[in-house]
Design a protein with these regions (language model features):
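Active-site beta->alpha loop and helix N-cap motifs at the rims of alpha/beta catalytic domains
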Residues: 1-8, 13-143, 149
Length: 150
């Protein structure tokens, strides 16, 4: 898979009752696509994924797929602190028809490079769609080394 163009890590808008506001999300998706964005990344840090329950995350992925799946390349942010959860979210996104995944370093645990390799390898073995490694050392406390990428 070759990534070309602009991919937007989209926010997850909430209403006053802390539910995902899908009307606002539709307008956001329409706006970014009308302005040249070719791909959407729901479920990333910008999307406040840490504030979503598992069912909300799955509902978000399904909504974005149903609403924009024919208009944009979709990359699901499937980050979590536990590899088994990343695998479950990744398999669900792949089954929904997402084009790729974005997987960050597990937060808070500060894994070493051997542990990172084991984490990413387990996810890659569990799904058959491309994975973009999200290297955000300031947030994760660990940087993905070139050895892990190789």
């Amino acid at each position: 898979m070759k990534l070309r163009g602009v991919y937007a890590p989209i926010v997850t808008p909430f209403d006053a009752n802390e539910n995902i506001n899908y009307d606002v999300l539709k307008r956001l998706i329409d706006h970014v696509l009308a302005n040249g964005v070719v791909g959407l990344v729901p479920g990333g840090t910008t999307g406040e994924v840490y504030a979503l329950s598992e069912s909300e995350r799955m509902d978000l992925f399904k909504f974005v797929k149903d609403y924009a799946g024919t208009k944009a390349v979709l990359i699901a942010g499937t980050n979590s602190g536990a590899t088994r959860d990343v695998i479950r979210y990744s398999q669900a996104a792949a089954k929904m028809g997402y084009d790729a995944l974005m997987v960050a370093v597990p937060p808070y645990s500060r894994p070493n490079q051997r542990e990172l390799l084991a984490h990413y390898s387990a996810v890659a073995e569990a799904v058959k769609i491309p994975i973009a490694l999200y290297n955000f050392p300031w947030r994760a406390g660990t940087e993905v080394s070139y050895e892990v990428l190789d």
